[in-house]
Amino acid sequence: AKLDSEPGPKESPVKAAIKGMGMLFVNISFWIILLYFATSSLPGWATKNWLPTLFSENLSIDMSEAGPLSTFTIAISSFIGVIAGGILSDKWIQRNVRGRIYTGSIGLALTIPALLLLGFGDSFAMIVGGGLCFGIGFGIFDANNMPILCQFVSPRYRATAYGIMNMTGVFAGAIITKLLGESTDAGNL
């Protein structure tokens, strides 16, 4: 049986892709979600890419210790955040259609004090605690991106929309990583 979301027999895949992107780019909700996702990618990629350097310099430990410490800190706390964020939003959406949006916002809100702790912390507990808080918050946020997208984008265009979101997030991450690297090399960070 043909799914409703499959292109018709006379519609080429290229035409279907162009039509799908056209449908997304006229959807104001998609643009808002894209901006929300791209903006949050800046601290997300910056933290994940620069955390080993931050740990090494601020905690005076070798990179051979800072790399695994930062990876475990972010990975374990993000896993906890994904599980907690998924459970919370699944329960909240049953009472309020905006539950997933609110849950994702709570996750992003947790990243703010985390970034302050990471940036201004002067002890092991503060800096690693900031990393843990960031991971939990970003995990909560990340667990809800696709479900939020599903609330605003037709099933027919969701894969394209999510692909564009991911591409935009990676581009934002590349830009911030380059800027932070240049700033570090210039002695401004």
Region annotations inferred by a language model:
Residues 55-56, 88-89, 93, 180-188:
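Interfacial helix-cap and linker-helix signal at transmembrane-aqueous boundaries
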